[in-house]
């Protein structure tokens, strides 16, 4: 074993094994030693070619001009490796043939160069840094401009594995802040692995599955980089190979145990699979919808409605979460049993949790709001009975199957916002969703290839709206990665507009295009990412009326504004400034010109209780009724109408501003 330490002398130490079955080779001509076209292979002696016939290409690092070879019949003594190195190093065409490191968990090859990254303390001067490097026989290749006193240096040829010893000795120098060898691994494009039919059209068991959310196509524009997805669930295996990359895990928390270690319990498999669906790296066996997003695992296994539940949302908001995914809620009825009494239960959202959600929505993302998603439920029952998923400020996600129709168990109702692919039951073309599982034999898959992969690191049958929810959460991260300036409700609106209307016959879509089974349809990730970019600036005119108009008890007050423009409206924002000591008394409406044919639009309907004043801007996202004005001619008199519906409190209208885009 060799060791490398990132983060300085007190940073985390990583162990790497020396492979018994790999060699790394560089030729003078940079030609490959093993090629599908023999005439393109580098020229070597018959003896060397005979030994090479016992190897196969593992990976190639074109930029470095090296390739990693792996023995066809692995051994445990490294004898063939050493023989090959000895023979190849005598070949004129071979610049070097060396040993290879492997990750002891993933068994992926890692090539060490004879280069080092070294960063000295800020206060050291250049001459002192150069003196230290010279003492170790190191040559400066570059002084790095992105960090003070940082250098990329090389050791003498044939230093070999001693480069790790040099690195550790340098770290022990009082003036050295950071130091580690240059290690290179295979670079892989983000990919949808073959069983991941929910990400792209694929073939499984000879069947073409085309019921995906168009995710792989979206990665050309966004992979979620720069965003953080919080998974509130039963814990996450943060040491899983798909979450283990540097910086992937952010602000882990166990709100039940009150620790920062969200380790799953013995039977807690759910959260790891959810996290994999949302944002698995996709480097080894399963990609998440947003592979570039960071993961904030929050373990919550306390009772529904507990304070721990509320604390989960506050933790997420305070620690930088952009998206919060919740694949849990009240118990579901048995989906195939119409008589199960659980179908009828109504579970309200506690005030403590609602206020915590509101905190995340109002304060998260520097005021732009966290996007909160909930699984609609798996009881084949009304989601409207579930106070969590039906809360008006969250996105309730239903499940659709590999036929492009409703998953049999998926909850339905007016609160369903969208659908995302998941498993079905019978009939089904696939076992379900392929995603990360707790490492080894402890998760859903104990190492059975009928259940996933042989190592037990992936499951092939995750499902339910539990899988659909983090899938949709991943799309929200793709959107915010593309345009981080969006508010939470703008993200929700983009998801709505991105949806494909699936199952047009059985979906029971209403005039607005909303289905009780799919909401606005199945999310199309590519379309969502395309919609995320800000629209091109359009000509804007701003019209304002300023006048103190008294608001008396049980009376109607009005402030009018004349607009002469005759261009069709493309967008509208309405800003009101109303002083009042109890805004729960008020109904505030915007009355467009009679010539427009648009009925009064309610902006505020007795919400807010005893709070003071309404100083707010309304747009087409926050107030969908305003969309009725698109295409209308604004010419005429606009009136802000305030109706006081109760006694004891009074106030006044201060101003009305209408911003129109043409």
Curated annotation (Swiss-Prot):
E.C. numbers: 3.4.21.-
An MF annotation (GO) of this entry: serine-type endopeptidase activity
Active site location: 233, 270, 466
Every Peptidase S8 domain range: 196-529
Keyword Protease in annotation: yes
SUPFAM superfamilies according to UniProt: Galactose-binding domain-like, Subtilisin-like
Record Pfam families: P_proprotein, Peptidase_S8
Major localisation: cytoplasm
Record-linked Gene3D superfamilies: Galactose-binding domain-like, Peptidase S8/S53 domain
Keyword Protein transport: no
Keywords: Calcium, Cytoplasm, Hydrolase, Protease, Serine protease, Zymogen
Cellular-component GO terms for this entry: cytoplasm; endomembrane system; intracellular membrane-bounded organelle; membrane
Subcellular location: Cytoplasm
Domain of life of the organism encoding this protein: Bacteria
GO term, biological process aspect, one: protein processing
Annotated ranges, domain P/Homo B: 535-662
InterPro entries in alphabetical order: Galactose-bd-like_sf, P_dom, Pep_S8_PrcA, Peptidase_S8/S53_dom, Peptidase_S8/S53_dom_sf, Peptidase_S8_Asp-AS, Peptidase_S8_His-AS, Peptidase_S8_Ser-AS
Function: Degrades phycobiliproteins in vitro. Has a substrate specificity similar to that of trypsin.
Family listed: Belongs to the peptidase S8 family.
Protein name in UniProt: Calcium-dependent protease
Organism expressing this protein natively: Trichormus variabilis (strain ATCC 29413 / PCC 7937)
Gene: prcA
């Amino acid at each position: 074993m060799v060791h490398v330490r990132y983060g300085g002398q007190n940073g985390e130490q990583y162990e790497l094994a020396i492979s018994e079955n790999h060699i790394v080779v560089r030729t003078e001509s940079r030609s490959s030693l093993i090629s599908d076209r023999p005439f393109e292979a580098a020229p070597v002696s018959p003896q060397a070619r005979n030994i090479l016939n016992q190897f196969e290409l593992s990976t190639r690092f074109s930029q470095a001009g090296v390739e990693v070879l792996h023995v066809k019949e692995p051994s445990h003594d490294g004898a063939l490796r050493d023989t090959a190195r000895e023979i190849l190093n005598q070949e004129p065409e071979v610049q070097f043939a060396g040993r290879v490191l492997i990750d002891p968990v993933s068994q992926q090859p890692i090539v060490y160069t004879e280069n080092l990254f070294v960063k000295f303390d800020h206060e050291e001067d250049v001459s002192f840094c150069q003196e230290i490097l010279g003492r170790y026989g190191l040559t400066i290749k570059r002084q790095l401009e992105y960090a003070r006193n940082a250098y990329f240096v090389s050791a003498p040829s044939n230093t070999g594995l001693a480069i790790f010893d040099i690195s550790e000795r340098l770290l022990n120098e009082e003036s050295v802040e950071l130091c580690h060898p240059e290690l290179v691994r295979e670079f892989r494009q983000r990919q949808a692995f073959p069983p991941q039919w929910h990400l792209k059209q694929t073939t499984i068991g000879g069947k073409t599955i085309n019921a995906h959310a168009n995710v792989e196509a979206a990665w050309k524009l966004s992979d979620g980089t720069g965003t953080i997805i919080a998974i509130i669930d039963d814990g996450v295996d943060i040491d899983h190979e798909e979450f283990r990359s540097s910086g992937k895990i952010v602000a882990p928390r166990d709100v039940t145990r009150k620790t920062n270690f969200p380790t799953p319990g013995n039977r807690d498999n759910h959260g790891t699979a959810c996290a994999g669906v949302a944002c698995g790296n996709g480097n080894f066996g399963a990609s998440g919808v947003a592979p570039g997003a960071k993961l904030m695992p929050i373990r919550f296994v306390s009772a529904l409605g507990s304070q721990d539940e509320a604390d989960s949302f506050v933790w997420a908001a305070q620690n930088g979460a952009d998206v919060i995914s919740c694949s849990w809620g009240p118990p579901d009825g048995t989906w195939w049993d119409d008589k199960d009494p659980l179908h009828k239960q109504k579970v309200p959202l506690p005030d403590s949790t609602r206020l915590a959600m509101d905190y995340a929505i109002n304060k998260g993302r520097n005021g732009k709001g966290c996007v909160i998603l909930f699984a609609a439920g798996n009881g084949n029952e009304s989601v409207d009975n579930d106070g969590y998923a039906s809360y008006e400020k969250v996105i309730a996600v239903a499940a659709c199957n590999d036929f492009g129709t409703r998953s049999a168990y998926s909850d339905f109702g007016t609160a369903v916002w969208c659908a995302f692919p998941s498993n079905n039951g019978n009939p089904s073309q696939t076992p379900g969703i392929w995603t990360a599982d707790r490492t080894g034999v402890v998760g859903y898959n104990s190492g059975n290839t009928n259940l996933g992969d042989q190592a037990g690191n992936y499951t092939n049958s995750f499902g339910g709206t539990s899988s659909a929810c983090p899938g949709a959460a991943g799309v929200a991260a793709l959107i915010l990665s593309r345009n981080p300036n969006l508010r939470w409700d703008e993200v929700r609106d983009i998801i709505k507009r991105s949806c494909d209307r699936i199952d047009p016959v059985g979906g029971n879509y209403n005039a607005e295009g909303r289905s009780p089974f799919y909401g606005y349809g199945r999310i199309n990730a590519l379309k969502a990412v395309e919609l995320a970019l800000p629209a091109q600036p359009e000509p804007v005119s701003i019209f304002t009326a300023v006048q103190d108009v008294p608001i008396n008890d049980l009376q109607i007050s009005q402030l009018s504004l004349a607009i002469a423009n005759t261009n069709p409206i493309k967008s509208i924002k309405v800003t009101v400034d109303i002083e009042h000591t109890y805004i729960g008394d008020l109904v505030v409406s915007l009355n467009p010109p009679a010539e427009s044919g648009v009925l009064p639009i309610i902006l505020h309907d007795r919400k807010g209780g005893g709070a003071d004043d309404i100083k707010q801007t309304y747009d087409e996202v926050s107030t969908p009724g305003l969309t009725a004005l698109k295409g209308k001619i604004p010419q005429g008199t606009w009136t802000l109408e305030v109706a006081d519906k109760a006694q004891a409190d009074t106030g006044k209208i201060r101003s009305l501003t209408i911003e129109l885009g043409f």
